[in-house]
């Protein structure tokens, strides 16, 4: 036995332990789910490693998890004969949190116990959940392939530090003993433990056993009672010990599917929906796919691991097999069990493999089908999904050309038709409501819903009763650069180029517009001469009715929102000048047209331009100059 060493917990571990003890008291029984899950994973990992090194079994290939309790001592022990851990592995896995984005996770803590509980569940508490019910935890472990005298003893009270020392342990695997707090002794009760184990372990493919005490013999009685022989204590199987996904769907209850989701995702909440599918023929595989009810806290972390659990012929191969799911569906949880991949498959082999490509195509279509069915049959439930994952789904049209139209059909937007900020209008809804003669889907992208809904660019369209989709999420500009049409209808920005109403504009309106442009030629020239190269062009508007002026981007130029996105990303943006549109029928523009003093004319022109830029961009390059000019104009008007 080596000298005992004391190590300090990583700062994040201390924070997590504190948060768990204070936030998870209402979900305290999940400690058993987490520890049984870890034990089953250890068995799966040994089974996989032993494919190429059978000696790791050490003559004991019957993998299992065993749970026992000692009521007198107030302890619960979870033991497995899986892969085990080395001394370095113990220090690494039981003293640190090796997760990217950990600091961001702790920033998201609100102090609200119910919200923090859910967040901790998404983060995944694993081994540390032991301290929800225990004031001391002892771990004895030996890694497969290592000698008995290379085993390790780890112990901690869940405070600032833990101790590690080398011990002798004959059996392979890990044994975790929880020394229960005085107010948590209920978990040392056999009946209580059995009910939890049954709830959390029935779907696990590794046998989960619990020790059942023997009973003494009972002699026959004179009244005719039969003698009952003594029974010996033994380990009793507590679960079906068959992989849930290998069973027929009709034999699996909703509760079992829900518990299996929690087992693989470490989530506390039930999934929104799931799909269990078995395919036979040219390719043979089983998939079990889940859509969570809530988005993970680190969904936007680029380093976040995602993907499905991969099994080959029911043997666990790897977690987070991202090759089977496109990035825009990274929220999907579940597994795929293939009969066509080699057991020694690696991530590198998966990258360039025909089977992988075919499976990815199939499971992607299945997820999209799940969402299409949900959107059709339960709009309220789909709206809940969209609120959580809509922004991620908007990455789809750029990433998945083959399914672009299907993904587009799942998108939801706010609209002038509903008059509310909730994004609940589909492109199909829009097309169904299009006016006779309308050939385009009109939209606007702005910084906020309010900015989009109140934009002057919508004035003529509102007057004509033409619906406009209102987009205000950062990803929307990226989206519409890749989603240019739907159902044969072009998507058209109301802030770029000409409005192009086509047949929505009758002959008399076109004639009136042409007359107005002819009458305003002099004004347009004067304004362009006054503003010079601040604008690319000046023209009479086709979109304003109540506002004096607006700016629009050229047809082939970047929109205001795209420029903002690129600047925020630190990228150089090519200089572009807006087109300045005037509404000659507005009193301010009429006043401008009557102005004979060229200096005053230039000031009015500049003021209208700055107003239009402020309305479009939400800010000005030189706000002080704008205020100074406006004050000059106000003073002049009251003299």
Curated annotation (Swiss-Prot):
Record's subcellular location: Cytoplasm
Main location (coarse class): cytoplasm
InterPro entries: HATPase_C_sf, Heat_shock_protein_90_CS, HSP90_C, Hsp90_fam, Hsp90_N, Ribosomal_Su5_D2-typ_SF
Region annotation C: where it falls in the sequence: 565-639
Cystine bridges: none
GO CC annotations on file: cytoplasm
Residue ranges, annotated region (B): 348-564
Coiled-coil ranges per UniProt: none
One Pfam family recorded for the sequence: HATPase_c_3
Region A: start-end pairs: 1-347
Keywords, in A-Z order: ATP-binding, Chaperone, Cytoplasm, Nucleotide-binding, Stress response
SUPFAM superfamilies per UniProt: ATPase domain of HSP90 chaperone/DNA topoisomerase II/histidine kinase, HSP90 C-terminal domain, Ribosomal protein S5 domain 2-like
Molecular function, one GO term: ATP-dependent protein folding chaperone
Function: Molecular chaperone. Has ATPase activity.
Family affiliation: Belongs to the heat shock protein 90 family.
Description of how the protein assembles with itself and partners: Homodimer.
HAMAP family per record: HSP90
Name of the protein in its database record: Chaperone protein HtpG
Originating species: Shewanella halifaxensis (strain HAW-EB4)
Lineage: Bacteria, Pseudomonadati, Pseudomonadota, Gammaproteobacteria, Alteromonadales
């Amino acid at each position: 036995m080596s000298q005992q060493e004391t190590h300090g917990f990583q700062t994040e571990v201390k924070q997590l332990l504190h948060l768990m003890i204070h936030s998870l008291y209402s979900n305290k029984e999940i400690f058993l789910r987490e520890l049984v899950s870890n034990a089953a994973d250890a068995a799966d990992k040994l089974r996989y490693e032993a494919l190429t090194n059978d000696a790791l079994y050490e003559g004991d290939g019957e993998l299992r998890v065993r749970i026992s309790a000692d009521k007198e001592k107030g302890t619960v022990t979870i033991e497995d004969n899986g892969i085990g851990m080395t001394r370095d592995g113990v220090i690494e896995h039981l003293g640190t949190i090796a997760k990217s984005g950990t600091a961001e996770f702790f920033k998201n803590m609100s102090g609200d116990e119910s919200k923090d509980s859910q967040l901790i569940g998404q983060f995944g508490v694993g081994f540390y959940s032991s301290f929800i019910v225990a004031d001391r935890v002892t771990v004895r472990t030996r890694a497969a392939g290592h000698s008995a005298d290379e085993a390790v003893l780890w112990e901690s009270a869940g405070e600032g530090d833990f101790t590690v020392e080398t011990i002798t342990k004959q059996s392979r695997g890990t044994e975790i003993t929880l020394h229960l707090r005085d107010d948590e002794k209920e978990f040392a009760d056999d009946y209580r433990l059995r009910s939890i184990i049954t709830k959390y372990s029935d779907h696990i493919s590794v046998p989960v056993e619990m020790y059942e005490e023997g009973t003494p013999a009972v002699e026959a009685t004179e009244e005719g009672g039969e003698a009952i022989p003594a029974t010996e204590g033994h380990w009793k199987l507590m679960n079906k010990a068959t992989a849930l996904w290998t069973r027929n769907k009709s034999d699996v209850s909703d509760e079992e599917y829900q518990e299996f989701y929690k087992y693989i995702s470490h989530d506390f909440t039930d999934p929104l929906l799931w799909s269990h599918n078995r395919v036979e023929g040219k390719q043979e595989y089983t998939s079990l796919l889940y859509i969570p009810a809530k988005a993970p806290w680190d969904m936007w972390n680029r380093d976040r691991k995602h993907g499905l659990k991969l099994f080959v012929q029911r043997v666990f191969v790897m977690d987070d097999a991202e090759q089977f799911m496109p990035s825009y569906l990274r929220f999907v949880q579940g597994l795929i069990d293939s009969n066509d991949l080699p057991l020694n498959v690696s991530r590198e082999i998966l990258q360039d493999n025909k089977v992988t490509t075919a499976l990815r195509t199939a499971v992607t279509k299945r997820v999209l089908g799940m969402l299409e069915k949900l959107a059709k049959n339960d709009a309220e439930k789909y709206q809940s999904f969209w609120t959580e994952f809509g922004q991620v789904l908007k990455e789809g049209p750029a990433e998945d050309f083959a399914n672009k139209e299907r993904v587009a059909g799942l998108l939801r937007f706010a609209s002038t038709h509903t008059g509310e900020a909730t994004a609940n209008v589909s492109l199909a809804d829009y097309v169904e409501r299009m006016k006779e003669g309308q050939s385009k889907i009109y939209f606007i992208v702005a910084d906020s819903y309010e900015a989009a809904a109140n934009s002057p660019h919508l004035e003529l369209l509102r007057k004509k009763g033409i619906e406009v989709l209102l987009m205000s999420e950062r990803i929307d500009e990226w989206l519409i650069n890749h989603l240019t049409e739907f159902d044969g209808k072009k998507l058209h920005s109301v802030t770029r180029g000409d409005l192009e109403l086509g047949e929505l504009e009758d002959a008399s309106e076109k004639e009136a517009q042409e007359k107005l442009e002819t009458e305003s030629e002099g004004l347009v020239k004067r304004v362009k001469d006054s503003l010079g190269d601040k604008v690319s062009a000046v023209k009479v508007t086709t979109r304003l009715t109540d506002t004096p002026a607006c700016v629009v981007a050229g047809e082939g130029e970047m929109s205001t929102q795209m420029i903002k996105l690129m600047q925020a990303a630190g990228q150089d943006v090519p200089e572009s000048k807006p087109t300045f549109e005037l509404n000659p029928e507005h009193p301010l523009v009429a006043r401008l047209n009557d102005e004979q003093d060229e200096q005053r004319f230039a000031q009015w022109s500049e003021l209208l331009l700055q107003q239009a830029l402020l309305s479009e961009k939400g800010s000005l390059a030189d706000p002080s100059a704008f205020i100074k000019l406006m004050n000059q104009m106000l003073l002049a008007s009251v003299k």
